[in-house]
């Protein structure tokens, strides 16, 4: 889903916990993602990993984190906001803010919290 919105490519594919040599991984966790890196512009990437309950990770969906995207243009921010927030919950719509930027915050349809920020350039509205 995220690649379809942001574009880009997965660097080196997906690495799974079952790929760790000699690791004792419970069967139900072997196909969880150990590392993935989505590069969607020369200066922007998102890296991710699944949680591992067997390692003591406790998942608390909701306000446990936000992914923040700094975007290249006002239009790119609007497009990312519209696509990522569809079916989710909008906290703050994509709009001009007092700190001279366009900003939005929301949860996507998977419950992941996002912030999108575009800093306006001089003489840009």
Label for each model-derived stretch:
Residues 1-92, 105-125:
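Glyoxalase I/VOC metalloenzyme domain signal
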């Amino acid at each position: 889903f995220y690649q379809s919105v942001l574009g880009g490519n997965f660097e080196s594919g997906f690495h799974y916990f079952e790929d760790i040599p000699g690791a004792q991984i419970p069967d139900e966790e072997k196909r969880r993602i150990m590392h993935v890196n989505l590069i969607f512009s020369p200066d922007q990437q998102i890296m991710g990993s699944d949680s591992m309950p067997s390692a003591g990770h406790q998942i608390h969906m909701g306000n446990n984190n936000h992914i923040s995207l700094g975007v290249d243009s006002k239009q790119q921010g609007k497009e990312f906001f519209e696509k990522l927030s569809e079916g989710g919950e909008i906290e703050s719509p994509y709009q001009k803010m007092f700190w001279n930027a366009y900003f939005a915050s929301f949860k996507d349809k998977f419950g992941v919290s996002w912030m999108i920020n575009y800093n306006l350039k001089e003489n840009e509205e």
